[in-house]
Amino acid sequence: AWAVGIGNTHLAQMKQGWLESPILYMALIGRPGANKSHPLSFAMKPFLDYDYEQNKLFEEQYSKFEEKMCMSRKERIENGEDGFPQEPVRKRFLVSDVTPEGLSYIHAQNKRGLCLWTDELSAWFKNFNRYNNGSEEQFWLSIFSAKTTISDRRSSKSSIFIKRPYISVIGTIQKKILSELAKGERSSNGFIDRILFVMPNLQQKARWSDRELPDNIERDWQAIIQHLIDMECQINEQQEIEPHVLSFTEEAKARLYEWQHHFSEQCDNETNDTIVSIYCKLEIYIIRFCLIIQLARWTCGECDKEAIDLLSVERAIRLTEYFKNSAISVQNILNENMLTAQQQAIVNHLPATFTTAQAHDVAKENDMKSRTLERFLNDNIGVLFRKEKHGEYSKINS
């Protein structure tokens, strides 16, 4: 919600020419009945309320526009109206089921930015090939990096040109559908690595409770997000948003560089290319987190927004570590879904930490040959298992 409120109004500058938008692709994971949708609806309600009011205003304006268009130009001028009335624009933050072409059209009218909000995220990626094979997926890969998009509409001779797009994505997904997300090229072209997964440890079905949120919680949240919504945007001569660019303080940048160097060492020691790819995307996300956290603190009156400070970086590091662990958990779920019954039985029977000898004993009990076991262990280092030292392993998802 913070990121959507910021949109294209602010950017983080890591180095000269390296700017990051607060674009997030996020999935809330849980079993059916795990209460995934309600917290998301609560967080996005201020935008939903804004869009509702703007839609009512648009309908009123469009009705008047149609009345004017039914007049002749002479009649419009005689009535004190503009000879060529401008068609009204519907202001909004949220979109749902929409094609890239339709999304580009809406974005051109709402240059501050949009959020694709879908209750079931599976509907988003299952539609990627419904029109042009693979083109929608490429569209979202480009949007993630805020690359200029050009949409040539079939019904118009003109093109929609969006210099710096901002579209975040958020929705819920069930654990059993995660494997659908990794189908096709999405696991190899880095698409799935761009998604931030929120997966609570507690996956039980929510129990009904008489407890109510304090009255001030919703009111305060509405006021906080409304502060972002009401934030003035600077518009340049080309009618494009001129974002406020935040650089880092010297101590904040030094801490971020220190973290990145340590993170790079983890990548160097990681044998699984999929995990390395996830780590690389998190290096982009941490800069975006820094921007979002700084603006969140500014909105609440805790700091200024002249530059991103050390406290925002420290909090962004903690947030990145959370998403790193969540991504690894998701990869483990995906890998377990692809295991044979024999392989799954071996994983289930292995203790949290084990030796090669123990693994051979478990393999023997499940009719797996020694050479097959060794290949299974080696192929899944960094995926299912971690090699602690020679002859000793641990299970990653334990």
Predicted regions and their residues:
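Phosphate-handling catalytic cores of nucleic-acid transaction enzymes
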Residues: 1-398
